[in-house]
A protein has these predicted regions:
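Polytopic transmembrane helical bundles with strong interfacial aromatic enrichment
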Residues: 1-146
Length: 146
């Protein structure tokens, strides 16, 4: 029962975390070409989403993931798909902090023009890493069992 609750919490938090990361990149790129005051508002909104949505859900996803490993008494380490998923989770975690640094830079500058090209690349990287992580769980788990 505990494992089921942790799994549901993990999936929900991942959806909200990844969705918020993509939303941040969309907010920043939406401000490109606008007046400086409008760009400053877009940058502030992106920072607010990062602080109030993305970071808390990242923490919940991380804690529920470690909770699942602990509740299963390390069983996941025997499965090859878990190692791929864990590696991709670390990549997404790193992208989270890179995205946060870019958002802070945009807010400090009061403009989104300078970080918009990086945001497009970060958006693609987050989506690809998330899709590959889902592929590790669904495809490899189905093929190899567990």
């Amino acid at each position: 029962m505990l494992l089921t609750i942790l799994l549901a919490t993990h999936v929900l938090s991942l959806l909200l975390w990844i969705g918020s990361l993509v939303s941040i990149t969309r907010v920043v790129t939406a401000g490109v070409g606008e007046e400086p005051a409008v760009q400053a508002r877009f940058a502030a909104l992106a920072r607010r989403i990062y602080r109030t949505v993305a970071s808390p859900w990242m923490g919940i996803a991380t804690l529920s993931g470690f909770g699942m490993v602990a509740a299963a008494r390390g069983m996941y380490f025997r499965f090859g798909w878990f190692h791929g998923k864990f590696t991709l989770a670390l990549v997404i975690l790193a992208l989270h902090f890179v995205l946060g640094a870019r958002v802070r830079a945009a807010e400090a500058a009061g403009r989104t023009d300078g970080v918009a090209p990086q945001m497009r690349a970060l958006q693609l990287a987050v989506l690809v890493a998330a899709a590959l992580a889902v592929g590790c769980v669904i495809v490899l788990k189905a093929v190899r069992g567990a």
